[in-house]
């Protein structure tokens, strides 16, 4: 069968709660978070653990986790020892890239059932002892922060934080501090409402963690309820004196994981499964590394060309809020109304566990579409290094 007649479908989509930095999920490693998401995704798909042939999982801050973090997560989820596993690092796009590669693997006939997603425990990212391997002959040494070096800093302009490029984007495109704060407040308000009315309930697998000497069940995202909206306007710029980007209108450091089960529609039919959605296409875009905040615009444009969709036909968008300005510039350049974007809030409120976010926004997009009885959605994410990826899905009812 051709891909048009037998498309790739998503059978289940699950995420963990998003934990704050050094917060409720700090006792769990990235593979443990990934294992929880994978186990729940497989169970909700209605397949046996031995049915999964391949696991593709994103993880950016892998130093100190031990060999093959994706394999650890898969076996931790109870998958069969025969399951092949690959850990991916495409920065913030890792979780979505894992899903893209899972899609293409299924199209190629290399597997019949694949789990894709991403995981990150930013709380547990270690410090690195620079030059310790070769030795310190004399003078001062230094300790490097794995999270900053490999997650939050530009690789080309050494030591430059991602937030400074967000500042450049805001200035170049005329987004004021007030506009960015207003977006962050809307994101947080939406997330708080989603928690209050149970909109996240279907997409989250609760986690049991030790808090002090007690075992506690964590079923909600940690950070939105703690946000103090009245304090946002008073925050100092985080990246540049006199700048407009703050801790509130940026994504927060976070822990979490997300997983999706993919297969061909014919495979789902043979197994008696009811898919959540069809993947209609995916696209990637790359430009100058410092222009990563604008890259989702290019990825979405390419995606519309590949799918034959128009932007007006897309009913909901998830555009990862690495910084508020990323979503703002995407909405502005593509003329997308805010009412269609991140309807349950985004990373400014929930957090941005780097390797997981690309999968997390897909999970949240599918959940929001189904709750509202809508069909077509697009998820897009900017990626450090000047890239972005985007994916188009259509819900099945």
Where do the language-model regions lie?
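N-terminal extracellular/periplasmic Venus flytrap/periplasmic-binding protein-like
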Residues: 14-16, 27-35, 44, 179-270, ...
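Condensing-enzyme catalytic core mediating Claisen C-C bond formation in acyl metabolism
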Residues: 1-30, 229-294, 298, 305-306, ...
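Active-site pocket-lining segment
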Residues: 165-167, 203, 210, 280-349
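Conserved active-site "lid/cap" helical segment
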Residues: 2-65, 69-77, 84, 168-177, ...
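Conserved catalytic cysteine-centered active-site region
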Residues: 59-114, 156-162, 226-252, 333-360, ...
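Active-site-proximal alpha-helical scaffold in enzymes
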Residues: 88-120, 170-199, 259-266, 331, ...
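Flexible glycine-/small-residue-enriched beta->alpha junction loops
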Residues: 113-169
